[in-house]
Amino acid sequence: MQTVGWAKVKKVAPRLQLGDVKPVADEKTLEALIANRYEVMAGYARGVRQACKDEIATLQARQADVSVLRAAKRWLHRDADKVPAQAQPQLAQARAAHPALDKMVTMREELRQLWLNTSQSREQLTADLQAWCHRAEESGIAALREFSIRLRAARA
């Protein structure tokens, strides 16, 4: 509608700005994370879906059963309360069978808790973010390591 002149955009959501990668996350990184949490979590979800796709390809190469993982793929990147009850057993089975995906889902929930814990001080939240980044980089999962590096490059 904007291209034909019927509407005019007055406000646009801010985009996540990426700068130089910092050695450790600081308060500015935390502010950028909280301000752009939807974009950050969408990027994380893309990483989870890609890891799941890679896992399916690996299983297909070995002629293993991929039905459980395919059924759970849709729900792996969602919050636990958003997953329907009939999908819970498949999701639990897929997480138990694939520890890398389970680690990514667990780390996603830990990252989400950073902006839900409003009772903690900025210093404590920054320390939690630094610890999260360190655990993500030491996990041995390439997608988590890349996401952590990208997160440390975020700026407000």
Put a short name on every predicted segment:
Residues 2-32, 38, 42-156:
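Acidic/histidine-rich catalytic cores and adjacent linkers
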